[in-house]
């Protein structure tokens, strides 16, 4: 079993659904570069606090994952 990072799992799920980062950015009105960072497990350029959780929820919803579960996994990583 692969021991993927949180970001790598999100990217795999997004690609499996044939959704581009540009599509997510268009849907969420959040820059694609921020989601690229999420998929690389690098959120250093993100605003802090509640915004991070909001971005993760928006990404999850845009690719069809459970937003609350995904957010919990993000916080616990």
Write out the residue ranges for each language-model feature.
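Cytosolic/nucleoplasmic/matrix-facing N-terminal domains/tails
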Residues: 1-77
